[in-house]
Amino acid sequence: MEMEEVIAEVLQKIVPTEEERAFVKELIGELEGIAREKAQELGLEVKPYFVGSLAKDTYLAGDHDVDLFLAFPLDTPLEEVRERGLELGKEIGKTLGEYEIAYAEHPYVRAKYRDVKVDLVPCYDVRDWKDVRTAVDRSILHTKWVNENLNGKNNEVRLLKRFLKGIKAYGSEIYVRGFSGYLSEILVIKYGSFVEVLEKADFILRQKVVDPAGWLKREPEIAMKTVRREVEEDKPLVVIDPVDPRRNVAANLSWEKYGRFYFKADEFLQRPSLEFFFPTGKTGGDYLAELRRKGTHLITLLFDVPEMVDDLLFPQLERSARGFEKALSREGFEVLGWNTGRYGAEKAFVMLELDRVERPRVKIHPGPEFFTERGRDFYRKNERVWLVGKRLYAEKRVKENIIDVVRELLEKNQVALGKNLRETVKGAEILVDYVPRPLENEAYLFLSREKEGLKH
């Protein structure tokens, strides 16, 4: 297919219909009315703001998640914003029907209304970046800036978002580390169109710094401080927030996700296809056959997790997986990859691909110099001891089975784990070359590299 044909067909699928737009407009009107009514009942001077893709008209067809921010006056103490904001969110949630409390920088309410997810988030009613008190305050400014600068390129943003979703590079959550919706909007505003953003994938990376609002001229000291900080942390991009020179919009973007965009952008420009937007790749397969093909082994730990949102859980799962990777490497096992996720509502898993599940019965254990106190202690404690020069060496018996090795590492606290997972991981069920049926496809996608691979 020609590129124009591909884009036209994608737009048919992702641009909301008039009927859908009417539903969204009605939904927003109802929610705003409820929010104002409840704020008035509680005697709160709060302004409701709709932010995010719905408020900017950059949402994809069928994606109606609502972000409703409850903005308090700037002179309100932070603790009051948290407490009264949560109280207001609960009252709105009760009216909507069902809700739960979620936690980020401060608690907020997640509700559901007419089959649409609604986040009710307390914030400050900020006018510019100098007013920002909490991380969420900027969202009001983001929505205003995009609406003032998008100039009818809404569908170009939709194309970029759908493309990024299709290549698994969309979402700024800490467990995704991809492109946020706001970053997508900025790139389209800066470079003109979906195709032009793709054409500049290499240029953007080499340029490194994107400054759409000209902060480097307006606030050079603050903006340069942001640039230096992000460059020192080896971030792929520094996109100075158009509404706040202190912030890098691409701060959560990983090298891996930009790398996916880098290659897939070029592939699409060379060979346009719907597959980039709506992939039909494998969703599962035979993980045991994959293990036989590779000659490797799969270790899976299943454990209970405390109740927490994914934004908090997934970084801790990742930290735990990296902890196992380092600890097992020290023990002589080669960890070829790891994978984490939820398993049902109350459990999580860590998968580790290893070169083997057994190791030699003995290991050469280097000791201290023989004429030291530690040397004499080493000589007393070990059976087979010899000298190489002035240094002592011994044969040390080691655990052979991977399960025993993992258990011992956990018992001795030699694995760096997520802070809320330390106790539960110690009681994990450890499976070797086997996973429960609900995780079979997940195991296959991990082992085959279908999940994160660039080429298969």
Curated annotation (Swiss-Prot):
Superkingdom of origin: Archaea
Record EC number: 2.7.7.72
Residue sites binding CTP per the record: S53, K56, H142, K161, Y170
Required cofactor(s): Mg(2+)
Residues that coordinate or bind Mg(2+): D65, D67, D119
GO biological process: RNA repair; tRNA 3'-terminal CCA addition
CDD domains named in the record: NT_2-5OAS_ClassI-CCAase (cd05400)
Disulfide bond residue pairs: none
Entry keyword tRNA processing: yes
Keywords: ATP-binding, Magnesium, Metal-binding, Nucleotide-binding, Nucleotidyltransferase, RNA repair, RNA-binding, Transferase, tRNA processing
Misc remark: A single active site specifically recognizes both ATP and CTP and is responsible for their addition.
Function: Catalyzes the addition and repair of the essential 3'-terminal CCA sequence in tRNAs without using a nucleic acid template. Adds these three nucleotides in the order of C, C, and A to the tRNA nucleotide-73, using CTP and ATP as substrates and producing inorganic pyrophosphate. tRNA 3'-terminal CCA addition is required both for tRNA processing and repair. Also involved in tRNA surveillance by mediating tandem CCA addition to generate a CCACCA at the 3' terminus of unstable tRNAs. While stable tRNAs receive only 3'-terminal CCA, unstable tRNAs are marked with CCACCA and rapidly degraded.
Family: Belongs to the tRNA nucleotidyltransferase/poly(A) polymerase family. Archaeal CCA-adding enzyme subfamily.
Record note on quaternary structure: Homodimer.
Protein name per Swiss-Prot or TrEMBL: CCA-adding enzyme
Gene: cca
